[in-house]
UniProtKB/Swiss-Prot annotation:
Species name: Staphylococcus aureus (strain Mu50 / ATCC 700699)
Protein name: Fluoride-specific ion channel FluC 2
Binding site for Na(+): G71, T74
Membrane topology reported for the UniProt record: Multi-pass membrane protein
InterPro entries listed in its UniProt record: FluC (IPR003691)
Record keywords, A-Z: Cell membrane, Ion channel, Ion transport, Membrane, Metal-binding, Sodium, Transmembrane, Transmembrane helix, Transport
Protein activity control: Na(+) is not transported, but it plays an essential structural role and its presence is essential for fluoride channel function.
Cellular localisation: Cell membrane
Amino acid sequence: MISIILVMIGGGFGAIARSAITDYFNHKFTSKLPIATLIVNLVGSFLIGLTIGLSISISWFPAFFVTGFLGGLTTFSTLAKELTLMMTPKFDINLFLNYSLLQFIIGFIACYIGYHI
């Protein structure tokens, strides 16, 4: 039961952080590329790799930080929505492919780097 509460609390903080980051970048930058989602997913990928690589032995930490906070911070559903919305009558295949590659390949690389630090 305690792990469920830790996931809920961490997830709430992660979602608040994502919302703040999204608001900040949406007001600071105008771009065809959804930069805020890219940033939260890359930071989250790096941090999950770092967390796994450090093998933190605090019993409550994975539930609170990895599943909760990073689960709330990162967002696959928003990525899927953004990729779907790119498929308009003015569909730009290069933007679509570049954004997809940035999310998946650079996300993996960020996780890998975090793991091996």
